[in-house]
């Protein structure tokens, strides 16, 4: 199995720790585990230019520098694990910025068929409330996934 964990922050706090605990519990020795840390691996915000929708994702200004590698990792993964702390009842801005880059894959545009066969887990941690809304941010931005 190929597992990709996308971490909403560079900090290896509670969300990261829970994500790693899940991986340690389910991954076998021959499974491949990769991690993305935001914003290091994707520091750019979506510009809203819609070139990805009109011309193809390879025309995004951030495609060659960041998105080509991340998209390949997402497409190759069997399991996606999203980890995020809660910031004012929502996911981190950088997680939202990453997911905004995949708007071209929404159902109304060009859904990626391979996403329908993937499993995804969203992990959010908070000192109080807001975990449900943070997970909803990720779920609603999810690339063709109705149930995350």
Task: Outline where the language-model segments fall.
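Proline-centered loop/turn at the N-terminus of a beta-strand
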Residues: 119-121
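Conserved small/polar residues in nucleotide/adenosyl-binding loops
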Residues: 146-148
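Short acidic/polar capping segments at secondary-structure boundaries
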Residues: 125-129
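Short, surface-exposed alpha-helical segments at coil->helix boundaries
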Residues: 16-20, 131-136
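Short, conserved loop/helix-junction motifs that constitute active-site signature segments
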Residues: 111-117
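N-terminal beta1-alpha1-beta2 submodule of the flavodoxin-like/Rossmannoid cofactor-binding fold
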Residues: 1-111
């Amino acid at each position: 199995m190929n597992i990709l964990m996308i971490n909403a922050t560079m900090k290896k706090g509670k969300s990261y720790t829970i994500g790693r605990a899940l991986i340690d519990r389910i991954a076998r020795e021959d499974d491949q585990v990769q991690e993305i840390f935001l914003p290091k691996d994707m520091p750019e915000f979506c510009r809203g230019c819609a070139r990805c929708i009109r011309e193809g994702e390879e025309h995004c200004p951030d495609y060659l520098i960041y998105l080509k590698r991340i998209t390949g990792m997402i497409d190759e993964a069997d399991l996606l694990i999203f980890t995020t702390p809660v910031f004012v009842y929502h996911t981190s801005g950088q997680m939202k910025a990453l997911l905004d880059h995949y708007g071209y894959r929404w159902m109304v545009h060009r859904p990626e068929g391979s996403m329908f066969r993937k499993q995804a887990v969203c992990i959010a941690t908070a000192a109080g409330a807001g975990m449900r809304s943070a997970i909803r941010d990720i779920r609603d931005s999810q690339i063709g996934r109705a149930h995350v």
